[in-house]
């Protein structure tokens, strides 16, 4: 069954002053995440919305590089699927960096988040 698609990003439904905790349950254990909307409000709102819609339910990590990274969130399993919309990058002024144990959103280039 194809993944659900939307025409535009969801309206803001989160409180940008709060941090959010997320648990991703896998067959290898549970991954606990903290999301920081004060640094990337659209990205956190997008993740919270799609998770609430069941968009990620049953989705596999389609790319695994041992001792480096895992990539998931694409219901097609190809690495190029998404919810049907895009939104702008939120990196300017963002103090968070790509370090060990950090979650980031992959995209297809500038302003192609979704």
Predicted regions and their residues:
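Cyclophilin-like peptidyl-prolyl cis-trans isomerases
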Residues: 1-114
């Amino acid at each position: 069954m194809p993944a659900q698609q939307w025409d535009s990003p969801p309206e803001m439904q989160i409180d940008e002053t709060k941090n959010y905790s997320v648990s991703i349950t896998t067959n290898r254990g549970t991954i606990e995440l903290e999301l920081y909307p004060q640094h990337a409000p659209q990205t956190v709102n997008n993740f919270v919305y799609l998770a609430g819609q069941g968009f990620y339910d049953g989705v596999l990590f389609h790319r695994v590089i041992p001792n480096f990274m895992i990539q998931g969130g694409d219901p097609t399993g190809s690495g190029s699927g998404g919810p049907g919309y895009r939104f702008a990058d939120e990196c300017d002024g963002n103090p968070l960096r790509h370090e060990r144990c950090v979650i980031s959103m992959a995209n297809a280039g500038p302003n192609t988040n979704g």
